[in-house]
Regions:
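Acidic, polar-rich low-complexity tracts and alpha-helical solenoid repeat scaffolds
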Residues: 2-6, 17-263
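Sec-dependent N-terminal signal peptides
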Residues: 7-13
Length: 263
């Protein structure tokens, strides 16, 4: 998935979280590679060091330093913010499991916090960023869909709900693509029933995706191959009613005229 686009909202919120640094009165400094070693430091110094590493795109070190803020100053008001910034830093560094764990820890400690929606959104983004091509296992894709749906259910009026909805559409399109890929695989091997079940899944569950017209055409093909012209006609009719101008309907019409003109 397009990381640049999906990161935009996450970056915007992280800027809001970091903007509070000015309230601490922190200045320069931040150290070098020794920043992540355990050295007792005041919260200002630690948080500033983490922010500098984040600004420098040194995400893993930034995450470790934000973790240190919580570890060394667990009762500071900045510990809670550091937890969430740790999750964001891991996300930006593409350490998605670590980001998810950090966000879940934040939610377990602060379930009703005003930034809880952002934590749920970060978790969803971490799964979303890991969606692979349609030829691979889709477990991560399903986790992304579930997490994005949770953002919508829990916080329908939040700034994240609309973006989650857009991503859900993309994830559904991806899942439909997987079903189509498997269906075509079976079809090439003349496994008509198996292929028809995959195409039917797309029509029934992912009818709003870009794959629906082709799925209806493939159903027309497979039903004809199985000697079921009446079922083929139904699929072609649905295709014509919903996608009359598509190339898939033109092909289905030609197919029906050639193989089942009386159906």
């Amino acid at each position: 998935m397009n990381r640049t686009l999906t990161s935009a909202l996450a970056l915007g919120v992280s800027a809001t979280l970091l903007s509070g640094c000015a309230m601490l009165g922190v200045g320069g400094g931040g150290g070098g590679g020794s920043d992540t070693k355990y050295v007792a430091r005041d919260v200002n110094t630690l948080y500033n060091a983490a922010k500098e590493r984040l600004d420098a795109n040194n995400y893993e070190v930034a995450a470790a330093l934000f973790d240190e803020v919580e570890r060394q100053h667990p009762y500071s008001p900045w510990a809670r913010r550091a937890q969430l910034m740790s999750s964001f830093s891991y996300y930006m560094g593409q350490k998605y499991n670590e980001s998810i764990n950090s966000a879940k820890r934040f939610l377990s400690i602060h379930p009703g916090n005003k930034d809880a929606p952002y934590a749920y959104y970060l978790i969803a983004l971490c799964y979303y960023e890991q969606i692979s091509d349609v030829t691979r296992d889709q477990k991560i894709t399903e986790q992304a869909l579930a997490s994005l749906g949770e953002v919508q259910r829990r916080y329908p009026n939040s700034r994240y709900a609309a973006d989650a909805g857009l991503k859900i559409d993309l994830v559904n399109d991806h899942l439909a693509g997987k079903e189509m890929e498997i269906g075509r695989f079976y079809q090439r091997r003349s496994l008509w029933l198996a292929s028809s079940l995959r195409f039917r899944e797309v029509v029934d569950k992912f009818e709003t995706t870009t794959h629906a017209p082709e799925a209806l055409y493939r159903l027309t093909e497979t039903y004809l191959a199985m000697g079921l012209p009446a079922e083929a006609k139904k699929s072609a009719a649905v295709l014509g009613a919903n996608y009359a101008g598509s190339k898939w309907y033109e092909r289905a019409f030609e197919l029906m005229q050639k193989h089942a003109p009386a159906a």
